[in-house]
């Protein structure tokens, strides 16, 4: 990843309006793990340390609709050593479809006291 001003979908980066806060999270997922459908209000740089991260995006569902079924309309796969800008404000489900543990890290560029994730109900 180099100097970027748009996310992987071409949406311009937007910085939080409140008090800035950077939260770094390291995840370790066993093979077969799958997150629930969710979205992040913020973006941030991410890196896959080992394994493979598969992300299915629903680019058509409204963020306001937290109860309806979601459908994958786009997929991205990131392998060990890949870095990318995590997508904000787009429903997605993330999984480890590989045969080894997935380890990845994300540094969320958010707002102090605000949630980093909204989960489908």
Predicted feature descriptions by range:
Residues 28-29, 41-61:
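Short, conserved beta-strand element in jelly-roll/cupin
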Residues 17-20, 39, 47, 70, ...:
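Extracellular/periplasmic catalytic domains that process cell-envelope and extracellular macromolecules
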Residues 35-44, 91:
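Histidine-centered catalytic micro-motifs
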Residues 5-8, 13-14, 20, 66-67, ...:
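Double-stranded beta-helix
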Residues 45-48, 55-56, 83-86, 103-108:
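Structural recognition of the beta-strand scaffold that forms the well-ordered cores
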Residues 37, 55-56, 86, 92-98:
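Short beta-strand His + acidic residue motifs that chelate non-heme Fe in jelly-roll/DSBH
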